[in-house]
Amino acid sequence: MEPGALLVFVGLLFFNSESASSAVCDVNIDPSRVVVRFGDPVIVNCSTTREDVFEAGWESSINPVNEPNSKITVWNVSSLIVWDAEPKCFINYMNEPRQCVEKLDLVIYKSPESVSLIAPEFMKIGVESTITCQVLDVAPARYLSVKLYKGDEQLGNRSFTHDSTRFPVNESVPFPVTPTRADNGAEYTCVAELQLGPGGPKPNPTKRSPPLKMPVVYKPSLLSAAEENVEVREGGSIVLKCSADGNPAPKYEWKYRIADNVQEITKDGVSTVNIPRASSSNDRVYECHAKNRYGVATKNITLTVKGGTPWIMIILLIIGVVLAIAIIVGGIKFCGR
């Protein structure tokens, strides 16, 4: 091979080698994902291993950077106070590809300003109601998780993964609740959590609503059998009892034939009918009605007054005693003679 041809061959080989080594985009961002609270500082490095660098820098709505003849460029913000920064690292080269751009995976977040519960004044047993979690001024929504708890039991969870809004938003999340009798006075709480993923703070930013105790209303339910049969001896005393559970607390009404020796007393949620010196006039059915605005429960107590010692027996017994005494006294006098 001629010397001139050899030089051309070597030159082409060198050119092709240099082109091959520079024909790739080599942009390295560190850290590759940044999670930063709104208003906090942030520092991110960007670099390349290629040698044919013309300039490097950052495109951003805050603190843009342009550094000629540098393989490293730093985006440094002392206080990130914009939501649409969208920083991109760019590197311009002398050879193809002439420019390479890499967008920073940046998450700017703000914990909720407040979390509260919106609920009806009361719930009715077996009827679906809605308890709403209200989350104010939180960002970004796509990382937000809203949960409703009854005590330590989670009742529901709502996320917003398809919401691309970067700016702070307000979210109202309704949760259906169908209460039981046991839920009366239960404590409900709403928890808003930002699940920010890799690079985010640990534990996740979380805000909890003040607890809310919810009354559950229901009609009265008897705490004892609805039918009872009781007995008392004539002249004896007896107390008939009636009690029920309800919300609001039930009021009691007794129905029976009026008698002078009957007294009604209601105390500590129990209503009683007190009957001293029972007689046949008290022998009847006593109806107890426990009422509130949502219903009534009825209890029937049948009282039987059993007769005492018959008067004829008492008279005969007295006569017998008198005769016995007379005989004894007469015998003593006879012996004395």
Task: Give the label of every model feature segment.
Residues 50-62, 137-152, 244-258:
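Solvent-exposed loop segments of extracellular immunoglobulin-like
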Residues 3-7, 36-41, 68-70, 78-90, ...:
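Solvent-exposed loop/turn motifs of extracellular immunoglobulin-like beta-sandwich domains
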